[in-house]
C-alpha cells in the first residue's frame, strides 16, 4: 500500500474511529482551518464555550459579540505562554485554566476527578489533521513550506506531528522517516543561521520559527511495522546553529547524533503482526489518556536545589532559574506504562486470588505442558503464594536507564490512580538505599510541583506507623530502617490489612554481610513473607492487596522464579522480569561503556589444601570452594591492593588531562573495609616517593550502607557523611572510591 493510501485508508480511520470501537476517538479536521501559528481557533472556542458557557458569554461582551475575535485574542494569549515554556505539555500542566480578561478560562480537563470521574475529560477535543500546510518563517522570510502527514491538536492547541512512510514504496520510518523530520529541522536552523549573518536579530525568532519542532510533546514517524520517537529536538539547536554560522558542520554530519536519540518505540511481543504493532504503539503514544500522562507526569522542568537549615528545619531552596526539560525515552515510558497497565489488571482481579495461577495454567497447557511437569511448575509458584495475598512485579533495569525518574514517574501515577471511585493506593512507599537517589527523588517531587505535604521521609518505626495513618501519600524510607519493617508490620497489622500500599524498592536484594552461610538480604522476600504470614494467620482474608515493585540490575535465579513472569515462548520453565533494560542494551545505546572491552587480567595465586573427603581413586569429582574464602583471602587481597595502587599512580591518575579517578566494587562491607585500610596504607607509602608526591591528597574513600555489625561508613571517612564524601570525590582532581556491590 502506497503512502497516501496508507494514510487515508488505514491511519486516519484508526485515529478517528470511536474509542469504544478500538480507535483513538480523534476528530478529523480539515487543514484549511489551522492558523499560520499552529492553532485551530474554532476548536479552542468550541471547547471553552462547552466547558464554561457563562465565562464564554461574559467574554463575548468584550469583543463586540464576535466569537472569531474572542477566539483569536485567547489564542494569542495562550501562544505567548507556550512560547515562553519548554513545551506545550509543561505549559498545560500548570495552565489547565488561565486568567483571561478577568475571567478564569478552562483550557484542559483532567480525568478521574473525585466528583465527576471522566465526565469533564470527555469534553476535551483531540483532533488529527492531514497534510496541514505550514510555513517556517524567520525575520519575515519563508525558509520552508512543510506539510506534515498528520498533525495533532488538543482543544485547538498544537501538540505534535507524525510522518508516515510506506515499506511498499521502499521507504522506512528508520531511514526516510527519521531523515525527513531531522532534515526539516536542520534545514530550518540552517536557514536561520544564514539569515542571521546579515540580520543577527533573526535568531531571536527561534521560539516562533521552530514552534512546530520544539514546542510539541514529541515528533514521531511510522511505517506501521516500526515507530520512532524523538523529544526535545531543540537540544541540538546550539551546536547546529553555531556550526552552520561558521560553516564547520553540514546537515549530513549532524544527522547521526540526532538519530541516536530518535529511538524506536518498544512493543510487547515480537510475535505481533504489523497491524497489531501499530495499534499498540499508537495507543501508547496518542490515546487520550496517554496524552494526559504526558501533560501531568512525563514532562517537567528539573531545577537545581540546595539544602538550607538543619534538623527539622532543613529544607531545599531552588538556586537555578532555568530548568532542564525532563521527559522519558521510549523505553522508559514503555516501562512505566507497562507497570501501570499491569497494576490496573491486578486491581480488576483483586478478589480472584487464583487469577494469575489459572492464567499460567492455561498458558502452560497451550504449550503442551501437562501432567507432573505442569503441576511441578504450578507448585513452585504456589509455594511462594505469588500474587495471592500481595502483588509483586520484578523489573530489571541496568545502569544508565534513569531509574530515579522511573521510580518517581511510577510513584506519582500510583498516587493518583483511582479504583472503584477512590484512591487505588492509600500510600506509596519508596524504599531506597543510596543517598543520591533519595535526593534525586526529593528534587524530582519538587520540580514536578508536588506539594511537600504529600510526601515525607521516615527514619524509624514510629514515624513509619504514623505515616501509614497520616495524610501524606508518598513515603520515602531508608533501606536500613526498612529492614526492621517486620516489627512495624506486626504493630500495624490491622491498619495494613485494611489499606492498599504500593512499595517501590530500589535494589531488592543486596549482599552486604559477607557471611558465607547467608543468602543475600532480599527485601522483596522479607516484605512479601511478612504480609503473606500476617494474612495467613488471619484466615487468609485480604481487604486490599498490597503491591511490591522491585528494581534490580542483577536478579538471581531464585528471585526470578519467585517474582518473575513465566516465559511462555518456551516450554522450559524459565522466568523473566516483568520488564527489563539490560546492561547490553545500555551499552548499545551508549549510556554506559562496555567493561569487557578493557579487561586487565591480574594474576593472583592462592593455595588451598585438598578437602578431607577427597578420594584420589574416584572419577569426575567436583571440588568447590566457597567464594568468600577466595574474596576474603588475605594474600589475594594484598596482591590486588598492591596492583591497584601501582596502577593508580603510574597510569590512571595521569589520564584525562591529569584528572583520572577510579572506583573499586567489593562484595561485602568487611572486605571493603579491609581493602580501604590496605590501599590507604600502601598509597601513603608510594606517595612518599618524589615521582608520586602530587597524589598524596587524592582521597581513598569508602561508601556503604551502615550495618550494626561493622563500623559506620562515616567513621571510615573521618566522620564525613556520605553526601560530603561523594561531593569531595567529585571535586577532587584524583581519587579512588570503594563501594559495596
Enumerate the predicted regions with their spans:
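ATP-dependent helicase/translocase motor core
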Residues: 1-18, 31-401, 405-427, 436, ...
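Short basic/glycine-enriched coil/helix segment immediately N-terminal to the Walker B
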Residues: 154, 348, 387-391, 420, ...
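Structural recognition of the conserved hydrophobic beta-strand(s) that form the central parallel beta-sheet
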Residues: 220, 475-478, 546-552, 738-739
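Inter-Walker segment of RecA-like/P-loop motor cores
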Residues: 446-487
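Conserved C-terminal RecA-like helicase domain
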Residues: 473, 628-739
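Conserved RecA-like ASCE ATPase "motif II neighborhood" in helicase/translocase motors
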Residues: 473-507, 511-537, 720-726, 738-741
